[in-house]
Amino acid sequence: MNSRERVLTALRHEEPDRIPVYNSFTPEVREALSESYNIDKSEIDFYLCHDCFLVELGVFNGFYLDFTKEDYKDRWGIQWKRIKNNYGFYMEIDTPPLHAAKDVYDYRFPYVDGEPFYEELLHICRRYGHDFAIIGGSVSIFENSWYLRGFQNFLEDLICNKDEAHFLVDHVMEYNLALGFKIIDAGVDILYIGDDFGMQTGLIISPQIWKEFFLPRWEKLIANFKKRKPGLIIAYHSDGNILPILDDLVELGVDVLNPVQPDCMDPELLKRRYGRRLAFWGTIDVQHTLFLGTQDDVRNEVIKRLKTIAPGGGLLLGSTHNVQMSENAIDNLREFYETVRTFGSYPITV
């Protein structure tokens, strides 16, 4: 069974030969793993036996355009700046392009044909699509909208400037519909969509706002994506606790939930409640276990997921976000992969 077969088998709720695995890393962690294993950075995913390739297009690739600059403006007109931390840096939005609610009426969206990473996606699909599961994203509505308007401003618009908010969200949806079609047509197995609607303990917005602005538009997008490619797997990303809208997402046709942060939603509860209809991608805590925990903590958490979530299929195991650098991160990642190699074969017997 090759990696592609392994992932697709698991996400269709059957047991493959072993648990499929995928992790993503910050640049600092990828560099440190390269040194730790004494291999080139470009070979890390192969060496660690990752079963997927993920290529992200759309508004989110503003995070990745140029790590060498202190700041830059992307094709959406979003100004980004580099923020340093103890172990490296990350990019965050400094200035959104839509300063006032009425600015949405004059904003010109970029052309979807100008997506800067589309050629990379085509290359990955052509070169690796037979052997590895290809995940293409990221289609967004809520986050794409607030990236343009600013987080607080957009939340206020959802209450106080509804006409402008609906106008913006409609145009964001249409862009992402076209983007999703391009990603699907490239040949991906899994379309990666979603919005961070969750905080640590609940939703950022009310269920009423979800139903007014976002549910009907996600319904349109998902229906069109599945019509475009029957059998397409839809993976929906939202950090945090989104239990209040999870029934809606399942009804809309979401196949996979990512990242399933265990401090926010109990993976075992989700498996019991949704395990026949929803597969899970992630579940290994990046806030504490991989970042601050011990190797024993990592081993115990991996074994717990193998015991409770992996049986019957339905699990793509990995971290719940990009693994960030810390004093423990590299040793903990090595422990993660060693534990998976030792205990991750089906039938799971730990």
Model regions: which residues?
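Short, surface-exposed, low-complexity cationic segments
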Residues: 83-104
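Active-site loop segments of alpha/beta catalytic cores
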Residues: 1-26, 31-39, 73, 82, ...
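Segments that shape or occlude catalytic/ligand-binding pockets
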Residues: 32-65
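Extended, non-catalytic scaffold segments that flank or surround catalytic motifs
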Residues: 52, 56, 61-62, 85, ...
